[in-house]
Amino acid sequence: MLQYQIDRIEHQVSDDRSQTGIFLIGPLERGQATTLGNSLRRVLMGGLEGSAVTAVRISGVNHEYATVPGVREDVLDILLNCKELTVNSRSQELEIGRLVVTGPAEVKARDLQFSSQVQIVDVDRPIATVHSGHSLELELHVERGVGYRPVDRRNEATTAIDLLQIDAVFMPVKKVNFTIDETAVSEGGSTRERLRMEIVTDGSITPDDAVAEAANQLIELFQPLATVTMVEEVPQEPEPTAEAQIPLEELNLSVRAYNCLKRAQVNSVSDLMGFSYEDLLEIKNFGSKSADEVIEALERIGISIPQSRTSA
């Protein structure tokens, strides 16, 4: 199997603090680049854990369609600004950030006060504009999670009336593109592939760390497949039908046939279903007439038994 390597050939940090990394992975056998590219892209875009603002409390506001006196933006605009805030929480617990600002002021993300567990990535992101003589008091809830978590309206009845929930986007990777270069040729003349991946993150994680974390998740996913355990399937006994549970007495057999069967420990139709016609003839004092009688009784309830043991 080919030993390939991964090289980061470019790294950029944009004005909004998002980061772009370009990686080359190769040489790879034909088809492996597509396998790697698709697998990594799926995990990068939806499987990495990230941080997001999940709720906002604004002093004096109890619903999202309100306005805040002395603040240029309405509540919906403030919530949108908070939702787009890029944060990185190192805590698995709920973290709360607060700010109290008196106008005139341009409130930005840097004005929020969090614990040392939370880093604000885009500190210059605007939150609101407060006019002179007015103030704004905010509380932001930050949590860690995976993927996208919409507001659960079912829980609103148990949530504080002034806590405005936000659809949370926990995905730290914003974009993943990959292309496959098939021009690299080995010494033996066989065509090899090289995977080129472009990864853009929101700045809460570097592209290098994102690739490493995605690769580790894939390793954990596939590792159990390296040791396949053989499990013998135990055949399950079929559930007895209603007819099979009919007691022998309800077949209305003659006294002779009934007594012979009882002495042979036959107590129900289920027991009879284990017999063939030849088996019935071997029961002591059980002749062909009695055997025919049993066959007819079983056929009346839709059950038949084989003529011989070999056809059973």
From Swiss-Prot:
UniProt-listed Enzyme Commission number(s): 2.7.7.6
Catalysed reactions, as listed in the record: RNA(n) + a ribonucleoside 5'-triphosphate = RNA(n+1) + diphosphate
InterPro entries: DNA-dir_RNA_pol_insert, DNA-dir_RNA_pol_RpoA/D/Rpb3, DNA-dir_RpoA, RBP11-like, RNAP_asu_C, RNApol_insert_sf
SMART domains linked to this entry: RPOLD (SM00662)
The keyword Cell division belongs to this UniProt entry's keyword annotation: no
Region (Alpha N-terminal domain (alpha-NTD)): 1-229
Keyword annotations of the record: DNA-directed RNA polymerase, Nucleotidyltransferase, Transcription, Transferase
Similarity field: Belongs to the RNA polymerase alpha chain family.
NCBIfam families tied to this protein: PRK05182.2-2 (NF003516), PRK05182.2-5 (NF003519), rpoA (TIGR02027)
Domain topic, free-text comment: The N-terminal domain is essential for RNAP assembly and basal transcription, whereas the C-terminal domain is involved in interaction with transcriptional regulators and with upstream promoter elements.
HAMAP family: RNApol_bact_RpoA
Protein name per Swiss-Prot or TrEMBL: DNA-directed RNA polymerase subunit alpha
The organism of origin for this protein: Prochlorococcus marinus (strain SARG / CCMP1375 / SS120)
